[in-house]
Amino acid sequence: MSIPHSVFSALLVFVALATTTLASTEACLPTNKREDGMNINFYEYTIGDQTTYLEPEYMGYEYSNTKKLGSVSGQTNLSIYYSPPCESTPTCVTYAVLKRDEDGYDPCGPLYETKKRDTEYCDPNTAYWSSDLFGFYTTPTNVTVEMTGYLIWSMGNRRR
């Protein structure tokens, strides 16, 4: 009686594992048509906060409880490089835009409050407006970026 019981137990464990494996792979299948590039959402983040991003809950889901600033889609170049450009030549492009204009178009227009980007003004606790993050006009110094999509690895002319 112990052998049939062992066989039954082993079979039960196998079926349970197979069911769990099938359920976990089915849950991750895409539901929409495939599109090139990633979708990127931007959420508020407190400027100067150097601890919240270390919390697993924040990185896992809590960031989405903050204000969503906007989104872009179809992004295929996912490199992020940003640093406040600090120059001493007083031209339009060397001024940090500190206030976003409602029409969001002319960064050197009269509706902006600007501050010269000299070394003394390159404070990490100052929000500099820029469109350096995937063309989205925001403050790269205090924003959380969420990227979603599927990566199809390309090798030459073949996709894997």
From Swiss-Prot:
Keywords, in A-Z order: Cell membrane, Membrane, Signal, Transmembrane, Transmembrane helix
Residues passing through the membrane, by range: 133-155
Subcellular location: Cell membrane
UniProt topological domain (Cytoplasmic) ranges: 24-132
Statement: the UniProt record of this protein carries the keyword Transmembrane helix: yes
Membrane topology category: Single-pass membrane protein
Gene Ontology cellular component annotations, sorted alphabetically: cell periphery; plasma membrane
Gene3D superfamilies attached to this UniProt entry: 2.60.120.1560
Secretion signal span: 1-23
Extracellular membrane side: 156-160
S-S bridge residues: none
Zinc as UniProt keyword: no
Family membership noted in the UniProt record: To yeast protein FLO1.
Name this protein carries in UniProt: Uncharacterized membrane protein YFL051C
